[in-house]
Amino acid sequence: MMKQIQVDLGERSYPIYIGQNLMNDSEALSRYLLKKRILIVTNETVAPLYLNQIQEVMVSFGEVESVILPDGEQFKDLAHLDAIFTALLQRNYGRDSVLVALGGGVIGDMTGFAAACYQRGIDFIQIPTTLLSQVDSSVGGKTAVNHPLGKNMIGAFYQPQLVLIDTQCLHTLPAREFAAGMAEVIKYGIMWDGKFFQWLENNVQALKRLETEALVYAISRCCEIKADVVSQDETEQGVRALLNLGHTFGHAIEAEMGYGNWLHGEAVAAGTVLAAQTARSLGLIDESIVCRIVQLLQAFDLPVSAPESMDFDSFIQHMRRDKKVLGGQIRLVLPTGIGQADVFSQVTESTLEQVICCA
């Protein structure tokens, strides 16, 4: 069972393939890799699990080499980006080469940014191995590295040639990482598709058991939504901003606690609850909607409150650096119901302080 979704961006359009054991499907990969020099970028966790397997498939297309980076958000920086450039330069890779991102969101973001920059742009494909990267970061062309003063502050919009999603990878994913990915899955239901949110409420156990049919449906629905949004607004000038539900608060948590201490999805989960509580305080939603959001996040063992060590001042200093800030105004994506959200720029700091201090 393989599902195909198209991201429509004119001449930069590309497919997303979703199914089980797709990493062994040479036909799906051949169009993008035949007679190419291939550099696989992966990390120390994923390499022992899947690097040999994917190399054996790709070696029939051309020369295949790899670079293995440390695993973790704390390594998503310029120093480790440079390791990719060094590998490309030392091995004389040209513009006809292809980078392959084999890993989670960190590997995908860094590989994509390296592809965007190297010789002013070379092809890359995404083979995401975590749920979070499968449903979110591998689709849409956002690539970046972190800076000590902010997450994803140095990057580019650069689309892959292909996204290949193999649900079998989720069977080797730690439970905490799977839960973190579910935060992004739930986000899609809150900000775009109320029926999908209800489906998630009714299929918690099937997803936690990693049932293939449930996984393929959930991942496909997320990718359909992401593809639709990106096709309308590739560079986040409008509707794409809705995909940042929970992220302004979440990025503040990640930055304050130190990248890697809270997983991105965990921070987004807590941030989504804060966004819902802010919406409730503004009269946009009622308490019953906040409760549904909290209960679904808790069903997947996700945090629903910020770290106790974080106060309003620590939140606001990071939120003021958020990429969505315009004219000095913090802009928040807030739910206006289950299945809908909007961007608000007139939320006062006193309102935020009340929400954060009472959370």
Curated annotation (Swiss-Prot):
Cofactor note: Binds 1 divalent metal cation per subunit. Can use either Co(2+) or Zn(2+).
Gene3D superfamilies hit by this protein: 3.40.50.1970, Dehydroquinate synthase-like - alpha domain
EC number: 4.2.3.4
GO BP terms: amino acid biosynthetic process; aromatic amino acid family biosynthetic process; chorismate biosynthetic process
Pathway: Metabolic intermediate biosynthesis; chorismate biosynthesis; chorismate from D-erythrose 4-phosphate and phosphoenolpyruvate: step 2/7
Top enzyme category: lyase
A single cellular component GO annotation: cytoplasm
Residues noted as binding Zn(2+) in the record, renumbered to the chain: E184, H247, H264
Role description: Catalyzes the conversion of 3-deoxy-D-arabino-heptulosonate 7-phosphate (DAHP) to dehydroquinate (DHQ).
Entry protein name: 3-dehydroquinate synthase
Protein source organism: Shewanella sp. (strain W3-18-1)
Gene encoding the protein: aroB
